[in-house]
Amino acid sequence: MKLAQDMNVDEIFLKQAAEAIAVISSSPTHTDPIIRELLHRIRQSSPLSAVIPAPENVLKAGEPENMARGLIRIPETQTKRTGGNNHSKEGAQLYSCAKCQLKFSRSSDLRRHEKVHSLVLPHICSNCGKGFARKDALKRHSNTLTCQRNRKKLSEGSDVDVDELIKDAIKNGTGLL
């Protein structure tokens, strides 16, 4: 195993990402199948397999010894895009997005997702002018390095006052970026 001082930035990032995924995956609550798949792909494709820990302690949903812990297996029809039908194996209805064909097990998830396709971006960052369809995405973006870089690009790119541009964007409901 390599020591931290012998690894480059990419190796350190991959190691930290794999460790974070392993920690999340080892929680006794429901493990997201996407997280399991990402960890599997990292282990398969990375030349750093010696750096990335194997999850001997990762609990697998649906296995008999883990059923007592409350872990359940989600049918593949609910975790992947499905073919023609809108029902999972258990008969639960899946809700399809008309624009991109993603399927959701709850109608509320579909309604939330559909905002991504909206042309009007009602949530505008007051610092850099970037528009978002959802308020939670704006909150995640606020005060990030990306936000600071966006503002810097706006101020360097024109002689117009950045704050005036942002006010217009908020009033019109269209992001600057």
Swiss-Prot record:
Cited PROSITE patterns = ZINC_FINGER_C2H2_1, ZINC_FINGER_C2H2_2
Task: Cite the entry's keywords alphabetically.
Answer: Cytoplasm, DNA-binding, Metal-binding, Nucleus, Transcription, Transcription regulation, Zinc, Zinc-finger
GO molecular function terms attached to this record: cis-regulatory region sequence-specific DNA binding; DNA-binding transcription factor activity, RNA polymerase II-specific; zinc ion binding
Q: Where in the cell is it found?
A: Cytoplasm; Nucleus
- The C2H2-type zinc finger ranges are 95-117
Stored InterPro entries? Znf_C2H2_sf, Znf_C2H2_type
Single GO cellular component annotation?
Answer: cytoplasm
The disulfide bridges present are none
GO BP of this protein: negative regulation of transcription by RNA polymerase II; positive regulation of transcription by RNA polymerase II; regulation of sulfur amino acid metabolic process; regulation of sulfur metabolic process; regulation of transcription by RNA polymerase II
Q: What does this protein do?
A: Auxiliary transcriptional regulator of sulfur amino acid metabolism. Involved in the transcriptional activation of MET28.
Q: What else is known?
A: Present with 521 molecules/cell in log phase SD medium.
According to the record's subunit comment, the protein's assembly and interactions are: Interacts with MET4 and MET28.
Identify this protein by name: Transcriptional regulator MET31
Source organism lineage?
Eukaryota, Fungi, Dikarya, Ascomycota, Saccharomycotina
State the gene name recorded for this protein.
MET31
